[in-house]
Amino acid sequence: MIDIQNINFSYKKKSFLFEDFSLSVANGSIVGLLGKNGAGKTTLLKLIAGLLPTQNGSIVVNGFVPAERKPSFLADVSVIPEEFSLPQLSISAYVSALKPLYPNFGSEKLDKILAEFELKRNDKLHKLSHGQRKKFLIAFALSCNSKVLILDEPTNGLDIPSKSQFRKILVSSVTDEQIVLISTHQVKDIDSIIDTVVVIDNGKTIFSNTLENVSRDYRFETATELNTAENALYYEKSFDGYHCISSANNDEETHVDLELFFNYLTTKMSKI
């Protein structure tokens, strides 16, 4: 479990990026972490991974304080950063060097994912394209079988077929004992695989709930007439009419349009 209570964080003497920030994430969750540019998504992931220290409050991840960076904690956390560099090694050499750090590493799992991504152990990392290197990092991180998997913009650099592969591989690879945190601006890339959505804005959690509850509490539909859309909680004009969010009122559940819902939440906050 991830339990964040009343943390403060700022870079140098700048104003607080997070002030009195709290968030809880249960084991078995695949969380979509959403927010505008500069909202602090990457910083939050670094705090959870122990790459940055908090300045107040507490973060506890599966019983560990991340900033203490105990080896037993680090062995159970895998991070795929948005920006990365890899050494001039073969995949095989890279894996041989790093897999001893992860006691639950699965070599057979790695080989299976590499094959699905059309990568080979003798491939040279520095000769791969950016998208291929990203796919290798995804394969390695999933093969670590860490209890916490942190993915910062994992679909950046992937083409459309690779994004589909990523979704299928992720869903088939994780277990109910793991927590997966995915920060992204590409909402449509993850809306079919996450079960929980967290939205942060201005240093606060403005929404945290399961997609099941969102589907139960809100109705997503397309209206053809403006007067119908104007009665909704929120709407956006589109080529096929007006995409609307309304209160569910015990209606039949509808598919959650996560991008529309994110826009609704952030627009609502901007008016407060």
Question: Over which residues does each language-model region extend?
Answer:
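Conserved ABC transporter NBD signature motif
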Residues: 57-68, 72-73
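ABC-family P-loop ATPase nucleotide-binding domains
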Residues: 79-136
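A short, flexible loop at the N-terminus of ABC-type nucleotide-binding domains that lies
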Residues: 1-20, 27
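ABC transporter nucleotide-binding domain
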Residues: 165-245
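The feature captures the beta-strand-to-loop junction immediately N-terminal to the Walker
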Residues: 34-36
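Helix-to-loop junction immediately C-terminal to a conserved catalytic motif
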Residues: 49
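Catalytic Walker B motif of ABC-type/P-loop ATPase nucleotide-binding domains
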Residues: 149-153, 158
